[in-house]
């Protein structure tokens, strides 16, 4: 299953070496891609690159590590890594999470 991050995405969690669990408002999916691959593909889907979005966030925020990534600005799709994005344990949390 291919997955692109959307407004309904809450979290992307590593499930195994090559799989992810994606949590949405009312659903949970197993995706046959790593969380980082989902991030890269989603940034491309919305017309940019992961590295371009990361570099912009670093420049604007003056931060170096674990910067939030604006996946799609018109719908405020913003995700935060819980650890280094290159780590196999990195979980991506959406700014859109609500109680």
Model feature map: region roles:
Residues 1-93, 97-99:
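Eukaryotic intrinsically disordered, low-complexity regulatory linkers and tails enriched in Ser/Thr/Pro
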